[in-house]
Amino acid sequence: METSAVLRSVRLSAQKGRLVADQIRGLQVERAIRLLTFSPKKGASIILKLLESAVANAEHNEGADIDELKISQIFIGQGATLKRVSPRAKGRGNRISKPTCNIFLTVSNK
């Protein structure tokens, strides 16, 4: 039994999100929650919310036991980049790119 959760257009770069995703891939859900709770990275709190959503989906839709769940798959893809302009001297402007990412998380009891 596999249950997934998806979070799109998160204001986080995919590169920084992958640092957190690599730490929890393949872990038991309980251990991953403990690791994410105390991680200082911005992506950890975002992935923690998504993980809790996936666990709730598994419990509600499939009737799964939370203690047996583990993270079978997590991957982070690059989303659309928001482009902004920062005003500079003498009428010029610099481009600022604000990257986003899409996070796909799957939990299973296997």
UniProtKB/Swiss-Prot annotation:
Name this protein carries in UniProt: Large ribosomal subunit protein uL22
PANTHER family from the UniProt entry: CHLOROPLAST 50S RIBOSOMAL PROTEIN L22-RELATED (PTHR13501), LARGE RIBOSOMAL SUBUNIT PROTEIN UL22M (PTHR13501:SF8)
Gene Ontology molecular function terms on file: rRNA binding; structural constituent of ribosome
Keywords: Ribonucleoprotein, Ribosomal protein, RNA-binding, rRNA-binding
SUPFAM superfamilies in the record: Ribosomal protein L22
Keyword Transport belongs to the record: no
The family this protein is said to belong to: Belongs to the universal ribosomal protein uL22 family.
Species for this entry: Nitrosomonas europaea (strain ATCC 19718 / CIP 103999 / KCTC 2705 / NBRC 14298)
InterPro entries per the UniProt record, alphabetical: Ribosomal_uL22 (IPR001063), Ribosomal_uL22_bac/chlpt-type (IPR005727), Ribosomal_uL22_bac/org-type (IPR047867), Ribosomal_uL22_CS (IPR018260), Ribosomal_uL22_sf (IPR036394)
Function summary: This protein binds specifically to 23S rRNA; its binding is stimulated by other ribosomal proteins, e.g. L4, L17, and L20. It is important during the early stages of 50S assembly. It makes multiple contacts with different domains of the 23S rRNA in the assembled 50S subunit and ribosome.
GO BP of this protein: translation
Subunit text: Part of the 50S ribosomal subunit.
GO cellular component: cytosolic large ribosomal subunit
